[in-house]
Amino acid sequence: DRASFVVINRHLPVPNFTQEERDGYLYLTTDKLELRYKLGTYPVSNDRCNPNLQITLDVNGVEEVWYPGKQDPYNLKGTTRTLDRAEGDVREWLENGLLSRVGWAVIDEREPRKDGSLSLMFERDTNGGMDWVAQRKDTAALDMYFMGYGHDYKKALGDFTKIAGKIPLPPLYVF
């Protein structure tokens, strides 16, 4: 799998899990969550009452269920590049961020951003040169990351840096 501008490291240790096929579904279970997928279906063709892909996790004794397309009204949002022309509440400008009061967040790299741009990939150079920027070849391919961390926001940010790389410090002159 190729690196993207956001997710540069896709090779992480795999947690212990069990796998079971039952009633036409594949179940992957860890000590933190359970993923259920209806075999033979496209995971984002969902009916919210009976999704063909869902993840269930326990957040402080409350069962939280996620499925593709589920809206998160408790997401704490991302950042904005500028506050130019800002008057009042600017949250509607912001895309969803990594932290949410429901205990999960999703990074969906196949969806267009609010500005219409798409996530770009790094194309491997097979001639020994450097990888280079490219559009996605398969625009229907799924490229989603579910981050289920409960309310351990520090862990969520730490895990994000494992896949996205270290966050650079601002230049010294800004301090």
Language-model features: where?
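N-terminal accessory segment at the very beginning of proteins
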Residues: 1-168
